Swiss-Prot record:
It comes from the Viruses. Keywords: Metal-binding, Transcription, Transcription regulation, Zinc, Zinc-finger. This is Putative transcription factor A494R. InterPro entries: Poxvirus_VLTF3, VLTF-3_Zn_ribbon. Putative transcription factor. GO terms for molecular function: zinc ion binding. The keyword Transcription regulation applies.
Length: 360
């Protein structure tokens, strides 16, 4: 019998095309795997790495201020954010204690036990984030008992997962009882992506506030905005506000420089750019991270947008007693919209045991 060569499927062709395209591009080198780690706990690792980022940044800030230095500082900040984004899932898992929950349906014959130990969580972190590969970290990421849920039957038997083309079933290896298996996902998982984007955007807002947005504003734009202030007979420094700069940029067709409104306002007024201390900037970021889960819990079901960033930073500044910062965060003009944000904010404050200060 003559063997007939198997024809390539469309999937095979697509895979070949993708492989060819990837081979034409120089991919970013990934961190090589090590065999050991200098850290012994997740808490120690996170604190140690954050401190390392801060020390690198401080060393550059204390040196000569050049464009190259600013680019390096910006890269360190991006690396720190990416590190935190990679680490957050393991921090959340680390806080989960070993729990046992009974399946509540009347016809259910199985019990599910979630096994998430601190040791295995740290080992998985080492493998995925620190790139530490050794027998213990490999066991942590491959052993079903540390990753998946363990199902047991009421008779004491262990479950086995049987999968066919139409459904998956849990089958007891002792009494033969069966139950459909349905994977479940937490709301946190589906919203983590948006939370990460918000954290990145907050970092951009804080950079803009301090004139560190990295975009050079042409002198012609500065002159055009300055001319608008002159036309409107605005000359005192207290009246040259970022909100007014944004209004003039829109009028002049320079909306692409919205992120530079603080820099432009400072250049026209002659007031030095605001500088936040590292401690205050870190505190603002920490507070922002803390409100993510409470916001998701208390937001109206149909609401897709997050709270106004100006509103959030305004409320943070109030809580921290940084009243001199309030002028930099203009609030929404509509009382109804402000009230709607206050309603959510009050619930967030209750959850976190923060003082609630009404806006309207």
């Amino acid at each position: 019998m003559i063997d007939i060569p198997k024809r390539d499927t469309q999937a095979d062709k697509d895979f070949s095309k993708l492989t060819f395209k990837l081979s034409k591009h120089k991919l970013k080198k990934t961190k090589k795997f090590d065999e050991t780690s200098k850290f012994s706990t997740l808490h120690e690792a996170v604190n140690g790495n954050i401190q390392l980022f801060q020390e690198k940044k401080m060393k550059l800030e204390n040196g000569v201020n050049t464009k190259k230095t600013e680019e390096k500082i910006k890269q360190i900040e991006e690396d720190e954010i990416n590190y935190l984004l990679d680490t957050i899932p393991f921090i959340k898992e680390y806080d989960v204690k070993e729990t046992v929950s009974d399946v509540t349906e009347q016809n259910s014959v199985f019990q599910v036990k979630s096994k998430n130990t601190h040791t295995n969580t740290f080992r998985k972190y080492l493998f995925h984030v620190e790139k530490v590969s050794n027998p213990t970290t490999l066991d942590a990421v491959t052993d079903r008992e540390t990753v998946d849920q363990i199902y047991t039957c009421t008779c004491g038997g262990q479950m086995e997962l049987w999968v066919n083309s139409t459904q998956s079933d849990l089958v007891c290896n002792e009494c033969g009882a069966t139950q459909p298996y349905i994977e479940t996902y937490s709301g946190k998982e589906s919203n983590e992506g948006m939370a990460y984007k918000r954290i990145n955007h907050l970092a951009e807002c804080l950079n803009a506030l301090q004139g560190k947005e990295g975009t050079n504003v042409p002198q012609e734009v500065i002159n055009a905005v300055k001319a608008e202030f002159k036309k409107n007979r605005i000359s005192t420094t207290s009246e040259i506000k970022p909100s007014k700069v944004k209004q003039f940029l829109k009028k002049l067709g320079y909306s692409m420089y919205y992120e530079n409104i603080y820099t432009i306002a400072n250049m026209i007024s002659g007031i030095p750019t605001l500088k936040l201390s590292r401690e205050l900037e870190k505190r603002l970021k920490d507070m922002f991270f803390e409100i993510q889960e409470p916001f998701f819990r208390h937001k109206p079901p149909k609401r897709k947008n997050f709270l106004s960033y100006n509103y959030v930073l305004y409320k943070f500044s109030e809580l921290l007693g940084e009243d001199d910062l309030l002028q930099y965060f203009p609030l929404l003009k509509c009382p109804k919209n402000l009230h709607n944000q206050d309603v959510i904010w009050k619930k967030i404050c209750n959850d976190l045991q923060w003082e609630f200060i009404a806006t309207v």
